[in-house]
Design a protein with these regions (language model features):
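PAPS-dependent sulfation machinery
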Residues: 115-222
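PAPS-dependent sulfotransferases, especially Golgi type II membrane carbohydrate sulfotransferases
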Residues: 1-66, 184-203, 210-217, 260-380
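Conserved phosphate-donor/acceptor-positioning beta-strand/loop module used by diverse small-molecule
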Residues: 225, 236-261
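Pre-Walker A (Motif I) flank of P-loop NTPase domains
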Residues: 80-83
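Pre-Walker A adenine-sensing motif
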Residues: 66-76
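Short His-Asn-centered micro-motif
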Residues: 86-88, 223-227, 311
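Glycine-rich phosphate-binding P-loop
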Residues: 85-103
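Post-Walker A helix-loop "phosphate-sensing" segment adjacent to the P-loop in P-loop NTPases
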Residues: 102-112
């Protein structure tokens, strides 16, 4: 059994810190621990790895709060018009974010600085930071544990990481935790309408992390991405009212089958009950709601705040889509960018990933009908 108080004690001992700041997130942390204990059947590896993951989130919370206390000027750092990648999962958004991050003028959330935010990175040492080697060792271990991951996702510790991991440090975004553990009760609580005020607070923490990372390590033009922003876009906009969005698109059945397969392979390392049919049912309902929410927001705040990127085009000519994003938002497109993208493609050939919808209880005809509002809107 995982004990929440023991996790908090371990985080305090590792950091020498004890001030949790605005500690609202400790309540959902207790919810999560209860759900893991009652709903997840942890593997031997998971029994060790899951508590360590939770302690790491608490460590980041303690350290971020401490840096803001000692350097209140961090709170004055401006995060201006961040560009967020949204949309269904498994739409090519990870590859797209890696390519967007090739531009030195664009700031991304790199894997190594996401895993441990503090001390805040500095421009002079960002390429030699000791955390890079630590993160690389962890990545190599993970690839041995889940070898399928290398086929499913382009990876690299100096490449962009999904910023859902920052929301996880606020013990929000239940679907993100479900990548590792089976916690349906926690997931239901964090996606319920009454949780939105807490999601706003989670995004406020998200912004504090960006301020910390940008403070001594520009550039200041952020590109961030995670599909869960699609569900929580209202909360996001309350914290980032000038945000713009790149919306990646793919046929829903392919997207749902692929994300369920990805989660299933990840989960098997951590739990003995990966529940494939539950994954299909849960993600079908979740993403239907998420897409409808974002469509409503798009109608309200305007088409000019969004640009659409299509998986079918990206696999043929990704540079074309990146150029179009730059043009839409008025960014300068470097002359070298096409070459950088071509080089990235050579280093990251597309992997093979077979996902069978029926294994996850996904009925093709039913999915087609349920997502018709979306596929007809975007010509999928």
């Amino acid at each position: 059994m995982i004990e929440a108080n023991a996790l908090m004690k371990a985080a305090k001992e590792r950091t020498g810190l004890s001030d949790w700041g605005d500690d609202w997130y400790l309540e959902p942390m207790h919810w999560l621990v209860d759900a893991i204990n009652t709903e997840s059947e942890l593997t031997e590896f998971g029994a060790g790895a899951v508590p360590e993951m939770l302690i790491a989130h608490l460590v980041n919370q303690l350290e971020v709060n401490d840096w803001f206390k000692r350097h209140p000027e961090i709170g004055e750092v401006e995060i201006t018009a961040p560009l967020f990648g949204i949309g269904l999962p498994r739409t090519g958004s990870t590859a797209f974010s890696h390519m967007m991050g090739l531009d030195p003028a664009t700031r991304i959330l790199r894997v190594w600085e996401q895993e441990r935010h503090c001390p805040p990175p500095e421009k002079a040492t960002e390429l030699t930071d000791a955390r890079i080697a630590i993160s690389q060792a962890g990545e190599e271990g993970f690839q041995q544990l889940v070898p399928e991951a290398t086929e499913m996702l382009p990876r690299g510790v100096d490449k962009s990481q999904e910023c859902a991991h920052v929301l996880m440090e606020a013990f929000s975004s239940g679907p993100s935790f479900e990548l590792f553990v089976h916690v349906p009760s926690f997931n239901a609580r964090t996606i319920a309408p009454e949780y939105e005020s807490n999601m706003v607070r989670a995004y406020e923490y998200h912004k504090r992390v960006l301020q910390l990372l940008q403070w001594r390590c520009p550039p200041n033009r952020w590109f961030l991405k995670t599909p869960v922003h699609t569900y929580d876009i209202e909360a996001l906009l309350k914290v980032y009212p000038d945000a713009n969005f790149v919306w990646t698109h793919r046929e829903p059945l392919r997207s749902l089958s692929s994300v369920c397969s990805l989660i299933y392979h990840f989960r098997r390392a951590f739990v003995d009950n990966p529940n494939p049919v539950y994954l299909g049912h849960e993600h079908r309902a979740y993403w239907t709601t998420a897409l409808k929410r974002t469509l409503n927001v798009r109608e309200r705040i305007g088409e000019h705040r969004f640009h659409d990127v299509y998986h079918r085009v990206q696999i043929v000519d990704p540079a074309k889509q990146v150029r179009e994003v730059y043009a839409h938002f008025g960014w300068h497109y470097p002359a070298e960018m096409d070459g950088w993208i071509a080089g990235w493609q050579e280093e990251h050939p597309k992997g093979k990933h077979d996902a069978r919808p029926e294994f996850f209880g996904l009925d093709p005809a039913g999915v087609e009908e349920e997502f018709r509002f979306y596929t007809e809107r975007f010509g999928l």
